[in-house]
C-alpha cells in the first residue's frame, strides 16, 4: 500500500465491495487484473497510474503469497486505457482521477487494464506529433509501448498527457455545444412563430377596422343620397317587372287611341273599358297585399305577445282540468275497490249457503227414508194387533213411534226455521253493505 498524504489506496474485488464510507474527496475506479475486476479506492487528485500499479501488486502479493503469478517490479507493468476498440498506454505520471473525470459520459465505455509492459503491442495506436519526430537509437520493434514511453523525457510525456486531456475536453465541449445549438434553434423557432402570430392578429384587427369604416362611409352616402329611410324605400319601390308592365300598358293605350282614331266602334270601347277595369282591380289587389305585408311586419310583435298570453292561459286551464280529472279518477278507483270487496264478501256468503243447502238436503233425504221404514212397521203391527185396536186403546209401541215421528218433524222444522233466520240475517247484512 502506498500512502499519499492522509489517504491510502485500497484494492478489493468489485463483487465483494462493502458500503461506501469515505470522505467527499475520495474516489474509486475499476481496473481489470487477470480477467477480474479490482476496485481501487482512496484516489486523490495527486494519484498517478504508477501508484495504482503498486497498490494492485501489493494487494495481489498479500492475498496469494508465494502462489502469486504477477511477478516483477511495478515498473515492469503498465495500465492500458481501452475505449471502443482503441487502446492507449498511460504514462506512469498520469493523474488517473483527472483522466477518469475527463471522460464524462463515456465512462461506461472506457476500461483500465493492468498488463505487463513486455506483453503489449510493440507500437502504440495513439501517438502524438512529438512522438513521431523522436529519433530513438533503439529499435522500435524491440520496445513495448510502456518501455517506449519510459524512454521519452518527462517533458514530452507531460505534453502527450496534456494533449490527450485537451482532446477529451474538446470532445466534451463539442457534445455540449451541439445540445446547446439544438436548444437555441428550438427557442428561436418558437420566438419567430410567436412573432408571426402576433403580426397576423394585428393585421386581422386592422382589416376589421377598415371594414367598419367602409360600411359607415357607405351608410352615410346612402343617407345623403336616398334619405334616412332608404332601406324601407328600397323594399317598397316598384320592381323592374312592374316598370315593364307600366310601359306595356302605356304602349297598349297608345295603340287603343290609334284604333279609336281609325274606327269609332262602340263595341271596341266597351271591351277596352272592361280590360281597364280588370287592370285596375289587379293593381288595387297588389297594393292591398303590399300594405297588408307592411302591417303584418309591424303587428308581429303584438301578435306574438297575445299568442304567448293565450298559450299561458290555455296551459293553466289544461292544468286545472288535469287536476280535476285526477281527483275524479282517484274517487272512481276507491269506489271500485269498495265494490270489489263487497262482491268478494257476497261470493263467500253464497258459497257458505250452498254448502249448508247441500247438508240440509242430505239430512232431509235421510229423514224421509227413515219415515218410510217407520210407516211400514206401523202397518205390519196394526194388522197383528187388530183386537186391541178395536177396543179403542192405543198400544204403547205405537204411541212411542208417533211421538218419535212428531219429534222428528219438530226437529226438522226447528232446523229449517233456524236456517231461515240465518238467511234473513245474512240478506240484511248484504243489503246494508251494498248501501
From Swiss-Prot:
Disordered as annotated region, ranges: 1-22, 380-435
Keywords: Coiled coil, Endosome
Disulphide connectivity of cysteines: none
Annotated CDD domains: RA_RASSF9
GO biological process assignments: endosomal transport; intracellular transport; protein targeting; signal transduction
Subcellular location field: Endosome
Biased composition (Polar residues): 400-426
Coiled-coil blocks: 195-290
Superkingdom assignment: Eukaryota
Residue ranges constituting the Ras-associating domain according to the UniProt record: 25-119
SUPFAM superfamilies to which the protein is assigned, alphabetical: Ubiquitin-like (SSF54236)
Gene Ontology CC terms: cytosol; endosome; extracellular exosome; recycling endosome; trans-Golgi network transport vesicle membrane
InterPro entries found in the cross-reference section: N-RASSF, RA_dom, RASSF9_RA, Ubiquitin-like_domsf
Function of the protein: May play a role in regulating vesicuar trafficking in cells.
The protein's assembly and partners: Interacts with PAM.
PANTHER family xrefs: RAS ASSOCIATION DOMAIN-CONTAINING PROTEIN 9, RAS-ASSOCIATING DOMAIN CONTAINING PROTEIN
Protein name (Swiss-Prot/TrEMBL): Ras association domain-containing protein 9
Organism, as annotated: Homo sapiens
